[in-house]
A protein has these predicted regions:
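Flexible, compositionally biased loop and terminal segments
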Residues: 1-334
Length: 334
């Protein structure tokens, strides 16, 4: 089945969608697509068929999101923990991924028409090399599209993502691109796999399980969490509407306020750190007792500007390193 399932909503679906759109709408929804194996057991089919039906439901859900004006979707496709499953199931999932990413490369016209940028987030080194190459082709082919975004978390856990971001910052310090004092929560944000995306407004988990399973733990601290009992392959447009309605009724205004307060708290902490560093600098230079407010402001501005220059240089180097790795995959089989 296609990644992009085209088609319009029914008359009744459009009517309800328009009612929803009268309220605050999420810009970014994340899904834990749980229940494929239970669906297969329920329908007395092979597990692989359950996973295949789960992919078909993803294509349908992306169409609903597009029709509702939700322009960014992140899905938990394969956890690093899933490698602990039986070899036959893991091999089947890798084969399914090969089929779907190969199909993706055949759908360039649809992707271009809808402006869909595909990002694959996770430790791709853990995947078979041929699958890495297919993923790299898909990411490169769609990287300049910007109407809507699909983030596929594959070989991913949040703990792995955060520890990788810490390693990237340590690399920046080792390379002389950063000072140890440049390391902060804000910089860690920019080193995550999701650095180009806003935090999800809603995180939806299907199948009735009430846990996050190590998915987007850093990014969802202020997200609306919705746990729904339906198995993923049986997910419907109405389940999605229910989740959006929960967001509108309980969370949307508080969410933005909480994010603004948290951002302000980060800025305040950074200012306090900068003020302490300037005080130490003036003390070393024998100017602490001068009490010159203009001098302190000048020093603060210079300190902030130098840090921002280092951080931007580091982030550019990090982007280049990641892009070079993807480009290298494209030439592996050549």
């Amino acid at each position: 089945m296609s990644w992009i399932k085209e088609g319009e909503l029914s008359l009744w679906e459009r009517f309800c969608a328009n009612i929803l759109k009268a309220g605050p709408m999420p810009k970014h929804i994340a899904f834990i697509m749980d229940g494929n194996r239970r669906y297969a057991k329920k329908c007395q089919v092979e597990r692989q068929e359950g996973h295949s039906q789960g992919f078909n439901k993803l294509a349908e859900t992306l169409r609903w999101c597009l029709n509702l004006g939700v322009l960014e979707v992140t899905v938990y496709a394969f956890s690093i923990e899933n490698f602990k499953r039986s070899k036959s199931e893991v091999d089947g999932l890798m084969d399914l991924a090969r089929q779907k990413f190969s199909r993706l490369m055949e759908e360039q016209e649809k992707l271009e028409k809808h402006g869909v940028c595909i990002r694959v987030l996770g430790d791709l080194h853990l995947l078979p090399l041929d699958l890495q190459e297919l993923i790299a082709q898909a990411v490169r082919a769609t990287k300049n599209y910007n109407k809507c975004f699909l983030n596929v978390c594959f070989a991913y856990t949040s703990r792995h993502e955060i520890s990788n971001a810490v390693r990237e910052m340590a690399w920046g310090v080792e390379q002389g691109l950063l000072e140890p004092s440049d390391v902060s929560e804000s910089l860690l944000d920019k080193c995550l796999y999701t650095s180009h995306s806003p935090p999800p407004d809603i995180l939806i988990r299907t199948s009735g399980e009430v846990r996050l399973s190590d998915f987007l733990l850093w990014q969802t601290s202020h997200s609306c969490l919705v746990f729904q009992p339906v198995l993923w392959p049986e997910y419907t447009f109405w389940n999605l509407c229910e989740a959006i309605l929960q967001f509108q009724m309980n969370h949307s205004m508080l969410q933005q306020k909480a994010r603004d307060m948290y951002a302000e708290e980060r800025r305040r902490h950074q200012l306090e750190r900068d003020q302490a560093a300037v005080s130490q600098q003036l003390l070393r230079e024998g100017l602490q007792a001068s009490g010159d407010a203009q001098l302190r402001r000048t020093c603060l501005h210079k300190l902030s500007a130098r840090r921002e220059e280092r951080v931007q240089g580091f982030l550019q180097a990090l982007e280049l390193k990641r892009a070079d790795w993807l480009a290298g995959l494209g030439t592996t089989s050549a």
